[in-house]
Amino acid sequence: MRNDYRIWLYSMLKKLLKFSFILSFPLILSACGGGGGGGSSGEAVGGGNIPTCSDNTDYTTAEYNFMGGGNSAGTGAGKYGLGTVCAGAAYGRGATGNGIDIAVLDSGISISGGSTDINDIDTRIASFQSGADIIDSDNVPEDDEGHGSHVAGIIANEKNGTGLHGVAYEADLHIIRVLNESGSSEGNSVASGLDKARGISGIDIANMSLGDSGVIGTTCNSAATCETSLGSTLYTALENFGNADVIAVWAAGNEGSSSPSVISGAALYDDDFKETTVIVVGVGGDGLLSTTGYTSDKCGVAATICIAAPSGGNGEYLYSNYSSNAQSTYGVNSYARGANGTSMAAPMVSGGLALIKQEFSSLTNAQVVDRLFATATDSGEYSKSTIYGHGLMNLAAATAAVGDLQAIGGSNNLDGNGVTYYNLADNNFTSSAAFSNALTNALAGQTMEVYDSFDRANFETNVSSFFTSGSYTSQNTIENHMLRLRPKTTKKTKNKNLYGSFTVETDGNYIESSMFNSAGGFLALGYNQSTNSFENAVDPLSNFFNDSNFGNNYLVNPYFNSGSGQDYFMSFRGNSSLGFDSFTNANGNDLGLAFNLNPLSSSEDGMKNAGDLEIVFGANYEQNKFLNSTSSGVFATGDLSNTNFTGVKYKKNLSNDITFVGSGYAGYTYIDKASNSYISGSTPLLTSSFTLGLAKANFIKEDQRVGFFINQPQRVEDGSLNLKVPTSSNSDRIVTYNNLNVDLEPDSRQINFDIIFNKTITETSNLSANLTHVKNGDHAKESNSQNFLSIFYKKTF
């Protein structure tokens, strides 16, 4: 068995013509002021086989294109390389490789000026964390051959605006020299290098652009035969490496074989390290398996753990660093050389895995590998799995959501028992107009995690994106004014037309005014189909347009604004009544109760000069909502939130023609928590509303009436909501939640100004007009003022 595991030099040292081209390259670099490459002048790249990327153009710079041989203007052949795997799309999503540790087992790294200090290593590489030289038994892995420097640069060359950058240009590298100046291992240097890498804390990925002349599936076709072929020392090191949960990336080999080399493919027969092993074959400038310049091995029997990536070949090269000991330099502390072979394809994938790993902290290393495979381009030419395995690496797809994005509920473990996932469209919260934009304003800039349905990869989104500000605007449109002007279902009781919810009219002086004839005293029990539901039970004449004769306009107080339902209102005695409402609407189920007491209505005539006073006590119970907000999914509220409220209504006849009216309501809302909801609690919410106004009869003529009113719709005056949202997750699949306490008081106060005019035309018909001005609509400071004019003619038959 041979233990001389040769690196794949990909014809670099054999092609003197190409070497001469590189020597002349400094002249081009100097003229362009940075960047460069050589070895191929072809402009057409891909030959129709490489898929088109929607890369973020902010990142497709000359530095981006350099690796693929592009010129300093960022055009031409440079579209090969990073552009082939759609790296720009991943960069646009924030992936850089930052914080990901990658071990490079190779021939070492170029050292500046022959230094023996690891900190002086060529600064083109973004970040060095450690180094080891297995060959010379020290900690300075100086590259005497050049191959390792080239590989390291493809993975993590720094992005600094000049020259070229690597795939994961902010990754941390750990350089372990396991190959000598001839590009061969010595003794058990590869096994020792694997053990060394495994012992480095935090290593996520290891790149091995090295191989042997054997072919997987022949002499190595089972765990036992692979161990025999490789030797027990190396095979044990491979097993231990896999058990350490480090992703191992291997070059397939450059022999043109039907399957990869033995050392890269041994994992196929051993589950201990199969799930974290990736074998890489190379595609050339035309997107096809490289057969010119070098001939890549095929995926063959190892297709399930194999993928394709750019490697140079078929008329193209990949450019990267090269050791000063083996290659002429250009620029300060920079080295560049074109090369081809699966040794170049492997670091492309190692860098790609680093981007995926950084982007999705919730994934285990095995899941990172699964995602790499699942998102590869596998259509057309790349559907040939015996050649390309899972297909061509696609970093745009790998860093995007796979399947539906979902919110987690019910657990802090992504795979835990009882965990529930909700599609994003099923999670929303529309605020009540009572607290308007308070939630969206407070949550601006706050982020939370959501997860895709493929492997629960974590994505960041704005919490506020699930929230919509509540609005009274729908009540202020002309169309809705017309709806409000529409008479309610009518019934007759003692020859009295009843509009809106039924009420008790035991005292004409209280209910009616001098503006029209009193109906006299009577008792009534009735039913009505209402469009403004419980507010009518609380305050039967809830807006200016519900009454047929305008006389009760002063009773308006928009404390509740609910959906349609059934209202009941019943009298117990001359000065008290009970309202009851039960309904279902789009926002959930409500049950409301109200008790009205008029302490002055049955008083002596002399007391009535003090005016008419009504005191209201009540409660409103809401199912799956509060204050008429709507919510679902992880923002749902519980089955029974309740509001306890009280109100005072007062009327005083200032003269035979002029009446003062006023009312005010206040209440506390207690929010019920739902299971799996991010709404984890709240303080009691204090709300209020008020109405003040003057009504004048005999305006100009006896058949004309006018009213001037000012009112404030229901508004939260004090109270807060606590949200507990997921903000991070780790590879142990544990989710961390963060508490957000949100003040629900809106940033302004809506005030409505109304002028109402009514003219009696005949005993059965009248004409009404209403002019409304709305200031700070929806209690929002940024709202524009609104004006509405409504005209309504009504005839009773």
Whereabouts are the PLM-identified features?
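C-terminal subdomain of the subtilisin-like protease fold in secreted/lumenal serine endopeptidases
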Residues: K79, C86, D204-S209, T276-I279, ...
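Outer membrane beta-barrel transmembrane domains
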Residues: N536-V538, N543-S562, Q566-S571, L578-N585, ...
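Substrate-binding/access-modulating region of protease and related hydrolase catalytic domains
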Residues: G33-V45, S54, Y59, T96-G97, ...
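Outer membrane beta-barrel translocator domains of Type V secretion systems
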Residues: N462-L654, Y665
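Extracellular S/T/G-rich loop segment that most often corresponds to the catalytic His/Ser-adjacent loop
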Residues: D106-I109, A267-A354, Q358
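Hydrolase catalytic cores
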Residues: A152-I155, H174-L179, G202-D204, G312-Y388
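Outer-membrane beta-barrel "beta-signal"
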Residues: N784-F797
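Subtilisin-like serine protease catalytic core
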Residues: P51-N56, T60-T61, C86-A132, S137-G187, ...
